[in-house]
Amino acid sequence: MILEGGGVMNLNPGNNLLHQPPAWTDSYSTCNVSSGFFGGQWHEIHPQYWTKYQVWEWLQHLLDTNQLDANCIPFQEFDINGEHLCSMSLQEFTRAAGTAGQLLYSNLQHLKWNGQCSSDLFQSTHNVIVKTEQTEPSIMNTWKDENYLYDTNYGSTVDLLDSKTFCRAQISMTTTSHLPVAESPDMKKEQDPPAKCHTKKHNPRGTHLWEFIRDILLNPDKNPGLIKWEDRSEGVFRFLKSEAVAQLWGKKKNNSSMTYEKLSRAMRYYYKREILERVDGRRLVYKFGKNARGWRENEN
């Protein structure tokens, strides 16, 4: 498969297994296995004890390390905890995730029998060291941050296309193409960006997607490790945890099926408005356009 960035990746599960670390022992019982989603990071806990949020973190890690687009793994099919995940057969993984199912199954089996409670667990088979992303504190804190919940009475996000179908095509074909994006009725109705207020301060609780993204960037203490500035002066930013951002947005919109693929397609509606721009050749990198308000330092 040829990725958007021009690299080549083989989804043969034999080529994507992790290097052989020490086997799981009774020591995993000393890891934090709390039933809540503050139960530690997923790579510190035996998969049997993962919460559904740690399952999603594991899926996000596979997306990042294999340079796959978010639509390749339908997160809504894995709204389950680790015990349920570990009980799934290869056939069930394939039904849930299509072509990527075999990769998920093989990786999980490797973690179950060869994992360890360690943060420096991963190494690819292509002589590239893959470091597990760390956040301080864990980004899962954002799921329970009641002080940063947006109002949910401003419409619902349009569900766009079947991500599983798109992913099968992406993995099986040697070239990647983007599906056409339909015009969103909600975006057609969206009003022009508000004029700068007299106090020169932006609205801290944005109601549109681009404002939601902006406010995450402007409140890193409340939302650590999700998105970061690449070039603040130019308005360039990068998604660090794309699926976590999508799930947080879905929670605000009462849409449990939200994925980064759907979120990124919704972001495209702002291109014509010159509110957001895609940075060519850089995965997960965007910038604010000339009509975006409230992100510049001199506006705060």
Swiss-Prot record:
Stored SMART domains: ETS, SAM_PNT
Subcellular compartments: Nucleus
Keyword presence, Protease: no
GO molecular-function terms, A-Z: DNA binding; DNA-binding transcription activator activity, RNA polymerase II-specific; DNA-binding transcription factor activity, RNA polymerase II-specific; RNA polymerase II cis-regulatory region sequence-specific DNA binding
One GO BP annotation of this record: epithelial cell differentiation
An example Gene Ontology CC term for this record: Golgi apparatus
Pfam families recorded: Ets, SAM_PNT
Residue ranges of the region described as Disordered: 183-202
InterPro entries assigned to the protein according to its UniProt record, in alphabetical order: EHF_SAM_Pointed_dom, Ets_dom, ETS_fam, Pointed_dom, SAM/pointed_sf, WH-like_DNA-bd_sf, WH_DNA-bd_sf
Assigned keywords, A-Z: DNA-binding, Nucleus, Transcription, Transcription regulation
Tissue specificity annotation: Expressed exclusively in tissues with a high content of epithelial cells. Highly expressed in salivary gland, mammary gland, prostate, and lung. Weakly expressed in kidney and colon. Not detected in heart, brain, placenta, liver, skeletal muscle, spleen, thymus, testis, ovary, small intestine or peripheral blood leukocytes.
Biased composition (Basic and acidic residues): 185-195
Induction: By IL1B/interleukin-1 beta and TNF in bronchial smooth muscle cells and fibroblasts. By IL10/interleukin-10 and IFNG/IFN-gamma in monocyte-derived dendritic cells.
Record-annotated PNT domain positions: 29-115
DNA-binding region: 207-289
Family as reported in the entry's similarity comment: Belongs to the ETS family.
Domains (record comment): The PNT domain acts as a transcriptional activator.
Function as written in the Swiss-Prot or TrEMBL entry: Transcriptional activator that may play a role in regulating epithelial cell differentiation and proliferation. May act as a repressor for a specific subset of ETS/AP-1-responsive genes and as a modulator of the nuclear response to mitogen-activated protein kinase signaling cascades. Binds to DNA sequences containing the consensus nucleotide core sequence GGAA. Involved in regulation of TNFRSF10B/DR5 expression through Ets-binding sequences on the TNFRSF10B/DR5 promoter. May contribute to development and carcinogenesis by acting as a tumor suppressor gene or anti-oncogene.
Full protein name: ETS homologous factor
